[in-house]
From Swiss-Prot:
Reaction(s) the record says it catalyses: D-glyceraldehyde 3-phosphate = dihydroxyacetone phosphate
Name the record gives this protein: Triosephosphate isomerase
Primary localization: cytoplasm
Enzyme class, first EC level, given as a word: isomerase
Gene from which this protein is expressed: tpiA
EC number: 5.3.1.1
Subcellular location, record wording: Cytoplasm
Naturally occurring in which organism (per UniProt): Hyphomonas neptunium (strain ATCC 15444)
Family: Belongs to the triosephosphate isomerase family.
Length: 249
């Protein structure tokens, strides 16, 4: 079974003062931990300082997006190599908010993931359906297409992470049922095995829809759930650590 990954996504939140939360998490995650792997994906302005705060601990730091190109005339964008240089070892690509706000297509997401792999950092590739797509019975069709087109050619199964984020459950307080999560995660696992063979069983699949300390134990017990991509509950160390401890049991 893949090692559990508990990943936080701060989104567009956090100033330098909020790095105290990073320090609190780092203090509770030993470098020698064999339990769940722990990651905080921070705004670009906090990655370097966050990496310094977590040094010597088991807490890893990541970015929230990257550009598909390695450098050039792309004002305001960040290359994956820049994130790595600042201390990131992971990067989220294809989050539904990026897809909606910035028009990032599956092809763009694949290019971003490829750029991350070239830079030596792990892409967390997000997939998920909208409420309209779920109500129309299109969930598995949407997931199958996103999986086929968002994972770059040449990627190795163990070098990527998949995050299933039902768009209708992000930041809404609504959470997919255990049955709904199991159906999609099992489908994703089958798609990974179809693409990568037995190596597809090594790819971690995270759930990313309003996970919090109150529901984490139930979600983490679902088949083929290898961790969480956590939004609001990652902003406070106490909440994030509560989920980490549940995963580490």
């Amino acid at each position: 079974m893949p090692r559990t990954l508990i990943a936080g996504n701060w989104k567009m939140n956090g100033l330098m003062a909020n790095l105290a939360e990073v320090e609190r998490v780092a203090a509770e995650v030993p470098a020698s931990s064999e339990g769940a792997e722990t990651l905080l994906c921070l705004p670009a302005t906090l990655i370097h300082a966050g990496s310094a705060k977590s040094e010597g601990s088991g807490l890893k730091i990541g970015g929230e997006t990257c550009h598909a190109n390695e450098k050039g005339a792309h004002t305001g964008d960040l290359a994956a190599e820049m994130l790595k240089d600042a201390g990131a070892s992971y990067v989220i690509v294809g989050h539904s908010e990026r897809r909606a706000d910035h028009g990032e297509t599956d092809a763009v997401v694949a290019a971003q993931a490829s750029a991350a792999l070239r830079a030596g950092i792990t892409p967390i590739i997000c997939v998920g359906e909208t409420l309209d797509q779920r109500d129309a019975g299109e969930v598995l069709t949407v997931i199958t297409t996103q999986m086929a087109e968002s994972i770059p050619e040449g990627a190795e199964a163990a070098a990527i992470v998949i995050a299933y984020e039902p768009v209708w459950a992000i930041g809404t307080g609504r959470v997919a049922t255990s049955e709904q999560i199991a159906e999609v995660h099992t489908s994703i696992r089958n798609l990974l095995v179809r693409r990568f063979g037995d190596a597809g069983r090594t790819t971690r699949i995270l759930y990313g829809g309003s996970m919090n300390p109150g529901n984490a134990a139930e979600i983490l017990a679902v088949a083929e759930v290898n961790g969480g991509l956590i939004g609001g509950a990652s902003l406070k160390a106490a909440d994030f650590l509560a989920i980490y401890r549940l995963a580490a049991q």
